[in-house]
From Swiss-Prot:
<feature type="binding site">
    <location>
        <begin position="333"/>
        <end position="334"/>
    </location>
    <ligand>
        <name>FMN</name>
    </ligand>
</feature>
<feature type="binding site">
    <location>
        <position position="282"/>
    </location>
    <ligand>
        <name>substrate</name>
    </ligand>
</feature>
<dbReference type="GO" id="GO:0016491">
    <property type="term" value="F:oxidoreductase activity"/>
</dbReference>
<dbReference type="GO" id="GO:0009695">
    <property type="term" value="P:jasmonic acid biosynthetic process"/>
</dbReference>
<keyword id="KW-0288">FMN</keyword>
<dbReference type="InterPro" id="IPR045247">
    <property type="entry name" value="Oye-like"/>
</dbReference>
<comment type="similarity">
    <text>Belongs to the NADH:flavin oxidoreductase/NADH oxidase family.</text>
</comment>
<dbReference type="InterPro" id="IPR013785">
    <property type="entry name" value="Aldolase_TIM"/>
</dbReference>
<feature type="binding site">
    <location>
        <begin position="42"/>
        <end position="44"/>
    </location>
    <ligand>
        <name>FMN</name>
    </ligand>
</feature>
<dbReference type="GO" id="GO:0010181">
    <property type="term" value="F:FMN binding"/>
</dbReference>
<dbReference type="GO" id="GO:0031408">
    <property type="term" value="P:oxylipin biosynthetic process"/>
</dbReference>
<keyword id="KW-0521">NADP</keyword>
<keyword id="KW-0285">Flavoprotein</keyword>
<protein>
    <recommendedName>
        <fullName>Putative 12-oxophytodienoate reductase 6</fullName>
        <ecNumber>1.3.1.-</ecNumber>
    </recommendedName>
</protein>
<keyword id="KW-0275">Fatty acid biosynthesis</keyword>
<comment type="function">
    <text>Putative oxophytodienoate reductase that may be involved in the biosynthesis or metabolism of oxylipin signaling molecules.</text>
</comment>
<keyword id="KW-0444">Lipid biosynthesis</keyword>
Amino acid sequence: MVQHHQAAANDDHQAIPLLTPYKQAGRPGSKLDLSHRVLLAPMTRCRSYGNVPQPHAALYYTQRATRGGLLITEATGVSATAQGYPETPGVRTREHVEAWKPIVDAVHRKGALFICQLWHVGRVSNNGFQPDGLAPISSTDKAITPDGYGMVYSKPRRLRTDEIPQIVDDFRLAARNAVEAGFDGVEIHGANGYLLEQFMKDSSNDRTDEYGGSLENRCRFAVEVIDAVVGEIGAHSVGIRLSPFLDYMDCVDSDPEALGSYMVEQLNKHEDFLYCHMVEPRMAIVDGRRQIQHGLLPFRKQFNGTFIAAGGYDREEGNKAVADGYADLVAYGRLFLANPDLPKRFELDAPMNNYDRNTFYTQDPVVGYTDYPFLDEHHHDDDDDSNAPSA
C-alpha cells in the first residue's frame, strides 16, 4: 500500500504546494530556508514536571522534526505568574535554559528549525498556580465566565500601570534565555485569550490609563513587548501569533479587522520581522462540511513578511492556501500531534492516525505523547531523516 502511494506521490509531487521549499524573498540572511511548508503548531502538552522541560520532550519534538522543517514549541512561561495549566514549561530560570538545551540540540540534529513560543496566561489561571496563592494578573479585574468543563479561573487582579514594564521585561529576558538555550527564535503568544490579547481586545480591557480605551492604547502593551523582544534578539528572530477573530476565554473584540490591521502595521515597522502567524476565524458549516472562512486575507496582503495561517487546516485546504498565495506556511496542531510523520503522510496522501483528545493534557510521558505510530516503524530512529519529504 505504501509503495502504491509512493509512486502516486512521485508522479504529482510538484503539484503538492505544501511540500515545496520556502525561502524568504529579499532576505538573503533569513533563517527561513525550509524544505517544506508544514509547521508544527504550538500545543500545550502539560508534561514538563515542575515547569522544567523533560527528556521525553526531546523524543516528542524529534519525532516531528524533518530536515528543513519548522517546529514551534508548546507555550512556554516567561515568569512565575505566567502559568495557568499544570506542568507547563518555563524559560525563565537557569534550570529551564539548561533543560531546554538538549531538546533543542536533538531537533537541530534532525535538521529542523526550532522556535520557542513565549507565553503569559494572564487571567487564564487560578490562585493555585500563582506565587504565594495570589490572584492572577490581567488587564482587568473581571473573571472569566466558567466554561462548563470544570475549569476554575480565579478573579484576576488588574495590573497597575507601573507594573506593566516589568511584564514587558519578563518577555525580553525570556527571549534572551531562549536564544541561549539554542532556539532559532521566539514566537510571542499574542493570541487565544492570554495576557497580550486580554489587553488588546475591548471586551477584556476596561482600563482608563494609557493601556486602555483606544485601539492604540489597548495594543500598547503588546507593541512594547514586541519592541523589547526585537531590541533584545533582533527582528530576524521574532515572530508573533495573533487571533483577532477568536473569542477564547471571553476575549472578543468589536472590530477584529481593525485590531488585526493595526497590529500588522506595527509589525511592518520592523523590516526583518521573522513572521506573522494568525489564526483563522472559527470554522463555518457549509453543506454539512466544516469550512475554513479564510478571513485572514487582508492581513496577508498587508504584512510585508512571511505569513503563517493556522486553524483547522487539512491537506487539501493547506495545499490550496499555499497555491493561492493565501499563506506562505501552514501550521498544523492536532493532525501533527497524532501523526508525527505528517509531511511524509501528506507526500504519500496516506491515511491519518486519529487523535485522542483524552490524552492531550495528561502528564503521561508516553501515552498520547510519543506513542502515535509512524507509517514505518524504522522512522522512530532519531537520526533517520527518511521521514522528510523529498525535495
